[in-house]
């Protein structure tokens, strides 16, 4: 086991806080509409330019191990806030730094860190309750666009495209962000259900321009095993052929003789068919096949339920208005499923979302809900260079998370004003001891810090602006983008309540841990001996005859 170095009391805290300051000072330069960019070196490829707090935080690793403890703890604040609320990472970092710096002064002056923490917790609870009172629900498309614009560093085009996407697929719908091919942002909306499986043979294509197999008013056969023997399929194929309608086959796989027969019939125009593999794997595949069956009004033909392929009838097949099968995706538009059955299925999946323990499972379940309930919107981010693409894509993703948070818990006035207005609720508090009162006082000062940082980044005098805003009421605040004092909600300067709340709670949590730490232990780096010099070249090779 490697030797350790241990530091106690102020010696440990001072070194750790040095690390907190290095990370926080790098991150906080990005805050506000006039925040600056940070350039991140990459071991491979071009450097990344970003104005995203969590991207900056994730890149910072300090050489001094005690300083690195501080940096990693604040990095954790940024990451947690990003995971929970999707935005507010810079605000959380600024708050954590302010609480730690103020708190250390009290600890050095002999205040009890545990009581300080209790005071901090009381003040944070009061501030959170006040934020909930200030919060107003987001209802209009314009408000969604405003929240998205603020989170995307005042880029109105990003706010608008997110609002359009939410209009089209609903607030529950899935919105994904992908690299675009042009210079402008584009929005693609897939109505109905899309899954990531394409045709099993290019011979199924009947629309060469779009390179898709388009089926109008088709039947849908859903089978949970492989199909290789055409005899199993013949009875159902004959029934479909008599109805003169196309057929989509979704199965674990269609291969050999069965696939060849389908292709030949398709080319000859005897029966218009297309075959695709079932989406997903294992239990998720079963669930997705069931979703498709409910959406199209069919059933999953499965031996587990005592059904067989050769006895399948038209009543057991699903139906849809139109299905398009591309090389990689299949889209089912306007399935013939019963709306009550679809609603019941969505309700059932929502229960599973609440019980899901992993983020991955939750995300996949939410995708299933969206596919059943609304559709999928894809925002394609356009940019001139790869560096710009990465930076812009990160901003779009941030803005998307922020708008979701706003829809969830509502919005408050942005620009650091909501936290400043929470001061009154904190000022009315009284702790059980003088040390707890010091913790409350500490938060009173810390909640000013986001506004101070926004103003400093805009090149103005922070104390003057803070006093002017404190003399106003309600949503009156400083708009750093225009340099004016105004009603921020009317101007569209909004922050999601969830983002502001999460930033404060996470910052206070980690800062309290640092203040109550009395020792720090790190591993001593081994001084490895220098490598011996390389031996000289091999002698005696001169006389060799080639």
Swiss-Prot record:
Pfam families: Cpn60_TCP1
Keyword Lyase included in the entry's annotation: no
Binding site for ATP: 30-33, 51, 87-91, 415, 479-481, 495
Keywords: ATP-binding, Chaperone, Cytoplasm, Isomerase, Nucleotide-binding
Principal place of residence: cytoplasm
Any one of the GO CC terms: cytoplasm
Similarity field: Belongs to the chaperonin (HSP60) family.
Protein's name according to its UniProt entry: Chaperonin GroEL
Organism: Bordetella petrii (strain ATCC BAA-461 / DSM 12804 / CCUG 43448)
Gene this chain is encoded by: groEL
